[in-house]
Regions:
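Generic extreme N-terminus detector
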Residues: 4-5, 194
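Bacterial N-terminal signal peptides
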Residues: 5-15
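Extracytoplasmic/lumenal domain signature
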Residues: 18-262
Length: 262
């Protein structure tokens, strides 16, 4: 059974898209103690990992919704978990920390303390590095096995989640209105692009390396991933805080606070 997760006010719903007698039939629901604002991630064996405002990270059986384990952090978990090649679950918390958890048991492998709240979701590089931002104005690269800091770069408060290009370049937006491209090995800035509003949208990367993202200036941008040069911009009727996706035929889909999807 393939599971399509849907978030509800204080829990997680799973709707079956493979075996339901009716489209969108609810397969199961799991209730947490507080709203769920994190997006679920699916690991090996179909386990669903998700964070909650109740300060916990949950691992759920993807077929039944039964809880496998929970891990308590010191703050709300708004960050969406990322899963390493070995099954390790990486997630940030409002308690200023980044956690690495054993995907099978939920036992903590390590934690890393940043200087402020972590809303950003991690991205995992080809070498296993965990890239994540904090509201302390910095983007961090951590060793996925040990949690040791490899590099950190000051770029402004990071509410956006980073994306990693095929060449290892890290792209991330900041509340300082800029999108940054950083060298994934060193954290050195390659280029930056300024918009007219804060960026909470996480970048999407096309097959040709084009970087797409939205801004609170109501626009969707397309930038050359190598140079940062603007290819085009599209103005919507409202803030673009959601993250775009790139579909077949290089079609870009994005939502806006003008109540429309483009």
């Amino acid at each position: 059974m393939r599971i399509l997760p849907l978030i509800w006010i204080s829990g997680i719903l799973a709707s079956s898209v493979a075996e339901a007698s009716e489209p969108g039939e609810v397969a199961w629901g799991f209730e947490t103690a507080s709203p769920v604002r994190s997006s679920p991630s699916i690991g090996g064996g179909g386990t669903v990992y998700v964070g909650s405002v109740d300060k916990k990270v949950y691992a759920l059986n993807g077929a039944t919704g039964e809880k496998k384990w929970e891990f308590v952090t010191g703050g709300e978990v708004l960050s969406s978990p990322a899963i390493g090649s070995d099954g390790t679950v990486y997630v940030g918390s409002v308690d200023k920390k980044v956690y690495a958890l054993n995907g099978e048991s939920g036992i903590k492998k390590w934690e890393f303390l940043t200087g402020d709240k972590v809303y950003s979701s991690p991205a995992i590089g080809k070498d296993g590095s965990v890239i994540i931002g904090s509201l302390d104005d910095h983007l961090y690269a951590l060793d996925g096995r040990t949690g040791v800091k490899k590099w950190t770069t000051k770029i402004g408060d990071v509410g956006s989640s980073p994306s990693i290009g095929l060449d290892g370049t890290v792209y991330v937006g900041s509340l300082d209105t800029k999108l940054y491209a950083l060298d994934g090995k060193t954290g050195e800035k390659k280029w930056e692009f300024k918009t007219q509003g804060r960026i909470g949208s996480s970048p999407a990367i096309g097959l040709d390396g084009t970087v797409y993202f939205g801004s609170v200036d109501d626009k969707l941008y397309a930038l050359d991933g190598q140079t940062g040069a603007k290819k085009w911009e599209f103005k919507t009727g409202g803030n673009v805080e959601g993250s775009p996706v790139v579909g077949p035929g290089n079609v870009v889909y994005v939502g806006s606070e003008d109540k429309k999807v483009y």
